[in-house]
Amino acid sequence: MPWMYILRCADGSYYVGSTINLERRVVEHNEGIGAQYTARRRPVELVYSAEFPDIRQAYAAEKQVQGWSRAKREALIRGDFDALPGLAKKDFSKYPTKRKPDKE
């Protein structure tokens, strides 16, 4: 069955992927086969996985989670699904804003 998965790398970063054989793929990551990102950050640990009916859905979930913040990924890993909607909103208050002057 197809899977979307999250690995925690030795440097504390996360890697998100999808595969049809989860056990084999985690072994490959730890052997340095495939993704260069994880090859340089071994060992890796599987911290989250979700099974999907087909690989297209697993790949779509992978792409979605890759776009998430670290905090949102960690909420998913913890199973804190109630926190996900709040973490989806970008906090623009920490960025300086520039407005066009009002036309008179």
Predicted regions mapped to residue ranges:
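GIY-YIG nuclease catalytic motif and its immediate N-terminal context
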Residues: M1-A60, F81-E104
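Short arginine-rich
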Residues: K63-L76
